[in-house]
Amino acid sequence: MRRPSWSLSLVSISLLLLLALPAAARNPIKNAFLDAYPNADGSVLTDVPSSSSHCGACHFDFDGGGARNPYGLAIEIAINGGMSNLEAVLSVENEDSDNDGFSNLVEVTDTVNFGNTPTFPGLTSGNVNTSSNVIIAELLDYLTPSGGSDTTPPDVLVIGPNGGESYGATTTQTVSWTASDASGIASVDLYLSDESGEGYKPVAKGLTNTGSFDWFVQNRPGVNNRLKVVARDGAGNYGDDTSDADFIIDPLAGGVVPTTLRDFDLPGTQPLEGAILEDPSATCITCHGGYDEAVEPWHTWQGSMMAHAQRDPHFLATMVIAEQDAPASGDLCLRCHTPGGWQEGRSFDTSGAMVTAVDRQGVQCDFCHRMVDPVYVEGVNPVEDLPILDDLDDLPPTQANGMFINDPAPVKRGPYPDVDASHQFLDSAFHRTSLLCGTCHDVSNPAFELGSGPNEYVPGNFDEEHPDADLRNMFPVERTYSEWTQSEYASTGVYAPQFAGNKPDGIVSSCLDCHMRDVSGRGADSGPVRADLGMHDLTGGNYWVPDIIETFFPGETDAVALADGKQRVIDLLQLSATLELIDTSGGTPSLQVKVTNETGHKLPSGYPEGRRMWINVKAYDEGMALIYESAAYDFGSADLSHDADAKIYEIEPGTSYRLADLLGLEPGPSFHFVLNDTIWSDNRIPPRGFTNANFQTIQSPVVNYSYADGQYWDETDYALPAAARSAEVTLYYQSTSKEYVEFLRDENTTNDLGLQLYDAWVTQGMAAPVAMATSSIDLNLTDAPGDTPAYRNHLGQNLPNPFNPSTKISFSQAEAGWARVAIYDSAGRLVKVLLDQHRNAGDYEVRWMGRDASGVKVSSGLYFYQLETPGYSATKKMVLLK
């Protein structure tokens, strides 16, 4: 009798569990949502005919899981920040997650002013089609609050400026108004017209109805200005009022040239009309950091100068001088150094004074991953890009000059098609190419236009927008991206495994291959392990500023990440050039130094002022006493000697005689970059694939120097003292010279930032140069100047290179003795000894058939060959490519 009774009890318990299942089995976040807003239970936020008890309040998939809509994502971020589920729900209720003009609280709870509420706080007409496991037509009436009984717009009155006022550009003035409505005023926006009301641009958005606002008057002088105040009531009705008559914005006094913001207006996303970027330290870090510092996006990005672009005191001190020289020119700088602050209108003060701590996170995650290619290619770019491009008044002609476009919606884009993210995501070919990099790494000054002569640039009409926004019709400030486009890296790719990371073939072709090299790891804490994860280190050439950022912005940096980033910079610099010494001595000591550019752009490249590379040559006599030095650097004073033999690689922009006469300046090389209109010299080493014609086309010609087409190296000859018997050569790189830091200190008449930078520079060690490569050589002389030249020790470059299946190695031996030529793989392991025997002085060659000591064919890759003879040793690289 007991067994049936026991079975009946199980059935009863199971039935009770089933009856209780809907409430108990709910997602805990959904439970918290309904605890906060019980009126939402049974509404469309929990039930629609095609999906009862759904999770569509937070997820695009109404069955739950997968990508969250903007409201669900905001809650997830709050939970990841340590809040309970209920605390997280309540913490975002005053936000407008879907950016439709209504707070989450209004959408979920305000059933008085609207006829269709509750509405979905994370869905809009722009993203609702992403929803799944639901009939979308059932959602369309519940995206934005509407249908209220209040259809009367607010009463709005502009009090001031209302006509006749005169305000100075870059001053702060009070805008005042009244706005009232029976449903209350939800928000107030301000707009300015400089055409007597014919067209308006936003100057402030989302203000509370305080009746006044401290308005920073942009540097857009004119006499036809009017202000519009737009108020939205709690029922979604809009009312507005404008100034009754024009008011004046007076020109800004000062500046070497009378530029205004109009001179630096460019197409693309505009302030207060684009994206509101997320704070990466509150959002991105929750999934993309804290699990693998070696490769995770967060830690590696935190160590890059991209993350600190707006914290860089060197940049900030430079921008002060630019603003002194050409008022409003800081706008061009802020575009790419704080794209978040720029888009949100905190660039109206072009000195950067309005920038916040969040803005100082520089070139941050949300900026890059919401970028839209301005040049739409059907079948390549996401179709979601089209309406974004269509909404812009002026499309950028190309990817350059900070003319970026950001998706106004919080939709991330990236290079992988198989991402399972908690946020909205689009596979983007743009994010797999170098085109994105060109946006901020081809910089031109739009205050200048191309003149009639070669390499001639003339000022445009001041206080007017550039006529065509074509970077080729402006003065070139930086051409790193364009230099890459004309290199062999961009055309065919180059076998360069030292840069290639995990790329199995070792071929490097894009900017990303070197500056975001492939590594193995996860892009997010729960993501798959990828062998082609782009490392977000974004390493460049600035190795000293990471040491001083914390001094200027305490508490805003990660010291470990910056130290890691600095080391990556040094490592990259030491891969960027190859140094070769050739003994050219006959009767007197002499030396040839060959520097080969291994990068995909000029070496050095990037921002030109104060950046340089040089060859330091030291010669010693038989007793190893120093008897000669060229391009000597004093590490105690940071002075570099400019002796007659000194080879210093740099670009020297400056002021032409033509412009100097016009502006009353001294002609010649100058650090006043925003006033520069000519290049006085440029002897930087071109990349592989260089031709003079192509580099002229991209406005990066060789100036006052000479490189032949196809040349990506430079050779410098040194006549040494008669007593010289050996030499030591070091190739140095310095990202900031003493002269430039002193310039920033001495020319600053605005504040003491230049002095602060100088003091920090001294404390740091004065940006001591990095040794990119070092080599030494013994010099072999004939007995007398008239003797027949002796053979010299020399190891030639193998031919062909790359090779398959065999290659020839030539070498010279200065005196009789043992000679050894050996092959090593990239890990330094001996592959084969080609020669190991006594030889007389003379010229020789050996051939390698691409086989190891056992006669087995070796695999493709990088190999080293080494020559050892009496008093001489040299090693070179070669590539076997099958």
Language-model region placement:
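C-terminal tail/sorting-segment detector
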Residues: 833, 837, 841, 847, ...
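Glycine-aliphatic tripeptides that mark coil-to-beta-strand junctions in extracellular
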Residues: 97-105, 109
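Proline-enriched interdomain boundary motifs that mark the N-terminal boundary
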Residues: 151-160, 791-796
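Primarily the internal scaffold of c-type cytochrome electron-transfer domains
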Residues: 133-134, 254-267, 294-319, 350-695, ...
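Proline-centered structural pivot motif
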Residues: 63-64, 88, 92, 107-148
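Short, solvent-exposed loop/linker segments at the N-terminal edge
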Residues: 164-171, 583-587, 800-805
